[in-house]
Amino acid sequence: MQKRIIECVPNFSEGRNMETIKQITDVIDASKGVKLLDVDPGEATNRTVVTFVGEPEAVCDAAVKAIKRATELIDMRQHKGAHPRMGACDVCPLIPVSGITLEECAELARALAKRIAEETNVPTYCYEAAAFKPERRNLAVCRAGEYEALPEKMMDETRKPDFGARPYDEGVAKTGATAVGARDFLVAVNYNLNTTSTRRANAIAFDVREKGRPMREGNPIVGKIMKDENGNTIMKPGTLKACKAIGWFIEEYGIAQVSMNMTNLSITPLHVAFDEVCRAAEARGVRVTGAEIVGLVPKSCLVDAGRHFLRKQNRSTGLPERELVRIAIESMGLSNLKPFNPEEKVVEYILEAEEQKGVKKLVDMTCTGFAEETASESPAPGGGSISAYMGALAAALGTMVANLSSHKAGWDDRWEFFSDWADNGMAVMNELLYLVDEDTAAFNKIMDVFGMPKGTDEEKAARAEAMEAATLYATQVPLRTMKAAYRAFDVVRAMAEEGNPNSVSDAGVGALAARSAVMGACLNVKINAAGLKDRAVADALVKEAEEIQAAAQKAEAEILAVVESKI
């Protein structure tokens, strides 16, 4: 399952006192469920940009704590710096990374702004996607007049904060105000060119960037720049929306680059920009030799690119995520100048590495290790995890047949049909792999309840309530396994009927594995449901499980009949 991950980039109005900065970032570093990625202080601006990621609730909690600490340490009455600012924490944008939309981030930002005002007494404005008023989408409108204008703005009906508005007082004088917003993930990428010409690089940049280039009279290079009736330069737009770009020469590398900031990946994905820069460069006799990603990228950015470059080859995209990332790296030459390590550049991988420190996941074991762990005297992993893994193998077999079929000689016109089925199978496989560990985690939740105190009536009641909740979850997880494993029949059936006949036996084994996964998980639903006090809920769960089991047995028989007819 895709986790909901957001990024938070608060800008604190202190860039010179490293001890103060550390005290603020220590609060974030100590917050559970978030990963501090970067701390970038600026002396001239007297401002520090901090970046951290995590699940939404954890990120918002850490943001409130960090802003509270900043208001204790920073006195805006003493602040001077080159950058516009209006508070100890000047801005605090939330950015969707995975499993969450910009609209959902905007709702989170509004709730965060309200919390900050209530819990830290700092007035807050909502900007960009979180803005309540259209004009406040522009941060400059919220920050107009900066800190010095707050005495006038605090009670002005048109300029007062969205939350925490009150007469200007000593508290506001010390903390200032904070703008909380939501925006898309920004990706900075430099395209490497086989030229040293900044002029050529700039020409390519102007061809593609949304702003484009000034229109000229006569000669397009040196002709007089055209103006409208108001005296504004008339621009010829470039080909890529939501992209800003310039050309420059990098002495360290000895080449020119097109340097691009991508402000909305949903409008212009990375692979679309890469292809367009290649096209524009070729039109000017220049080649793109690779690309350099500056900073971090969301995983989807590379996965989508990997799929794109496979589709251009008429190749199946139903491959493991890491392979899609590798294909993206190779296709765009991301290691052209220096090695591109996804573990250090992909936001989700960085967060996963942090979360998995000291955690032993079943799906990361070798086949032998998993079997030996199952055979040990520990009660977990048990039948639930094994059922989920059998289901994952069923989906994997169907996916394998789809991938083999998509590349079969003479079947070139059907590659997309099989690619779609491979994608379907990979999605089912990934969900079942998640459930391998989740089933064991659900069992461990029950074990944790046994450790709860039961000395008083209140403790006994809390323990009983926790046991019912844990038992319910331990019943719901294998039911999810049943549903996912049953979906594996779709790809297995399609491949038995339409796939490469040389692999029809593999589809048959997939059907056997899917049936076993469903039946095994059904046993786990029944044994766990027996422990539920709420018998109406228990009976409903068992009834649903038995219906899925009956359908699975029927599907297996039908698929095996097809397989036997082709062997």
Task: Show the residue positions of the predicted features.
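Amphipathic alpha-helix face/heptad-repeat signature
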Residues: 389-393, 421, 428-435, 474-484, ...
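Long, contiguous binding/interaction regions
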Residues: 1-365, 369, 376, 454, ...
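Amphipathic alpha-helical interface segments
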Residues: 185-187, 442-512, 516, 528
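Polytopic transmembrane helical bundles with strong interfacial aromatic enrichment
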Residues: 357-366, 372, 480, 487, ...
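A structural signal for well-ordered alpha-helices, especially hydrophobic packing surfaces
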Residues: 401, 429-436, 443, 475-482, ...
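Preference for long, well-ordered alpha-helical segments
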Residues: 112, 122-126, 135-139, 488-491, ...
